[in-house]
From Swiss-Prot:
This is Large ribosomal subunit protein uL15. The keyword rRNA-binding applies. NCBIfam families: rplO_bact (TIGR01071). Binds to the 23S rRNA. Residues 1-47 are annotated as: Disordered. It comes from Kosmotoga olearia (strain ATCC BAA-1733 / DSM 21960 / TBF 19.5.1). One of its GO terms (cellular component) is cytosolic large ribosomal subunit. PROSITE patterns: RIBOSOMAL_L15. Pfam families: Ribosomal_L27A (PF00828).
Length: 148
């Protein structure tokens, strides 16, 4: 028999039988239907997530700490290893070229070049920010690191 959507069945024993509750006392799951007597869990409905029974919940006991700076610049980060792979000796690299070649998806607040990886080609890199190691590595091979 060939496989098709209409004859797919779960492997025998892979799906547990459903628990049939409230079907008489001789079933073993009658009367209280495994819910016990009294208490919050005996009725219908669920307790909402993180509800701790009325005590002050954890998220309110822990102090508020820190904040998100609204003026912080969010740079798109590129490592030297990426520039080494994609560009040839003597190329001028600008954020617009990086967008064209689909190395970055968007500009956000600008491009920052980081120093991960080795650089062997002399490149002219124009970006909004450079890490100290990136600038040193670019200039060590005879390239230029220009801040826009």
């Amino acid at each position: 028999m060939a496989f098709s959507l209409e004859n797919l069945r779960p492997a025998p024993g892979s799906r547990p039988k459903s628990k049939r509750v409230g079907r008489g006392s001789s079933s073993g799951k009658g009367k209280t239907s495994s819910r016990g007597h009294k208490g919050q869990g005996r009725g219908t409905g669920k307790v909402r997530m993180f509800f701790e029974g009325g005590q002050t919940p954890l998220f309110r006991r822990i102090p508020i700490k820190g904040f998100k700076n609204r003026n912080a610049k969010e740079y798109v980060i590129i490592n030297l290893s990426t520039l080494e792979e994609v560009f040839e000796e003597g190329n001028v690299i600008t954020p617009e070229i990086l967008l064209e070649k689909k190395i970055i998806k968007n500009l956000k607040d600008g491009v920052k070049i980081l120093g991960k990886g080795e650089l062997t080609k002399a490149l002219v890199v124009k970006a909004h920010a450079f890490s100290r190691t990136a600038k040193e590595k670019i200039e060590a091979v005879g390239g230029k690191a220009e801040v826009i």
